[in-house]
């Protein structure tokens, strides 16, 4: 008969992205081995408590910084509820609504890297843009589900053992 079989421990390694010798504020890629599974979070937006899209009721809360803080807190709570955490992020996609004064998404007043770094500095420092963030992409959009929304997040995280 066979010997005792044990599950391997999950390993998640995010590789840094450099341009020359400069560290970029996104990861090159994340390699996950022996994960129990994955969590996919989509449509994370900052809406009022009584938001009801089927009745066109409610909309976004606050200014761009307030929306970013709310979304980040929401996705942290959602990950934890589903058995993962910020430590196990594999990839993040940011959809940022214009305007884009110089043509690029990063020029939008709705893109708030400062708020993102503030959040990660408090909750998961390894993912700050100046440290070793997960791979991510920032995509500029003309509109989101509600006219006053300025950012939406899609997150993939691994489920640990």
Give, region by region, the residue ranges found by the protein language model.
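N-terminal presequence-like segments and the immediate start of the first folded domain
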Residues: 1-73, 77-91, 96-161
